[in-house]
Each structure stands twice: as structure tokens, then as C-alpha cells.
Amino acid sequence: MTVLEIDLLDETKNLLDEDKQLVENILQFAAEYLKIEQGTELSLTFTTNEGIREINREYRDKDQATDVISFALEEMGDGETEIDWGEFDLETPRMLGDIIISTEKAEEQAKDYGHTKARELGFLAVHGLLHLLGYDHMEPDEEKIMFGLQKEVLDAYGLER
């Protein structure tokens, strides 16, 4: 069963089809595992270190490459008013937001951690999804919850280190 509608873009043009399929499969599994409603949408972009560095600089004021960045559409910004969508009879699907992964950083980290690139891509995809769902790891208690759930999902899927 397909829970998520994933708009996937490979800006690198270097990612293997099986890596893309693995990431999509893990995200679908995670969506079912986390009981995300059917038809929920997200975008997933694979980019280079330079591509993610530009995004990181523009949106986070950090002039460096990172492994994954998530932009949650349901997250409230400063001064924004929350809209109760429940009062509208809309047939539009829920859009979680965007996950951007640097494939170069994923390769670097896979080597550093001694596991496969596929495992690292799966880890980063689930990490990004959890951010879209509102999880964070800025505080120790938040980190424990998020990383615990991340491990639980990856273990349930069977993605080995």
C-alpha cells in the first residue's frame, strides 16, 4: 500500500535507481509505521554538497554542507497565525514539506560510520520525515525521543548498519 505521494527529484543525476527505490520504500514503510494518513504528500530532493550548502546558507545562515535539511509546511513561523483546516471542507491532501539530502555527504558519512550508502540514505530520509512530523533534537529529551523513534522505524524495516 502506498501511503505517501513522493515527488522525487535527483539533481545529481548520479543516484542509482535501487538507492532511490530503497529510500522511497523506507519512507512508505515509515509512513505506515507512524500511521500517517493515506495520500499525504512530500517532496524529496537529492542534491550535491554545494547544492545543500547554498540552501543551508540561504535558509539557516550556515555556510556549510550538511547531510539533510527538512522544511516542514505545518511548522509555525514567528508571527504566523495558525489556521484550523478542520473547519474547511477541503479535498486537498496533507502536504508535509520538503526533504533535501546531500548524496555526497551521505557517502562521506557512510564511510565514516562503516556502513553502506544505502543505509545512510535510508537513515537520512527517516530523519528528515520525522522533522517534517514535528520531531526535533535541539534538547536532550527531544533528541532521546526522536532518535529512539528513528531507530525503532529503521530496525522494524530491517535496515542494517
UniProtKB/Swiss-Prot annotation:
SUPFAM superfamilies (alphabetical): Metalloproteases ('zincins'), catalytic domain
Any single Pfam family the record assigns to this protein: YbeY
Chief localisation class: cytoplasm
Disulphide-bridged cysteine pairs: none
Protein name: Endoribonuclease YbeY
Cofactor note: Binds 1 zinc ion.
Primary role: Single strand-specific metallo-endoribonuclease involved in late-stage 70S ribosome quality control and in maturation of the 3' terminus of the 16S rRNA.
MF terms (GO), sorted A to Z: metalloendopeptidase activity; RNA endonuclease activity; zinc ion binding
Annotated transmembrane regions: none
Record Gene3D superfamilies: Metalloproteases ('zincins'), catalytic domain (3.40.390.30)
EC nos: 3.1.-.-
Swiss-Prot/TrEMBL cofactor(s): Zn(2+)
Entry GO CC: cytoplasm
Protein location: Cytoplasm
Keywords: Cytoplasm, Endonuclease, Hydrolase, Metal-binding, Nuclease, Ribosome biogenesis, rRNA processing, Zinc
Species in which this protein is naturally found: Listeria monocytogenes serotype 4b (strain CLIP80459)
Gene: ybeY
Gene Ontology BP annotations: rRNA processing
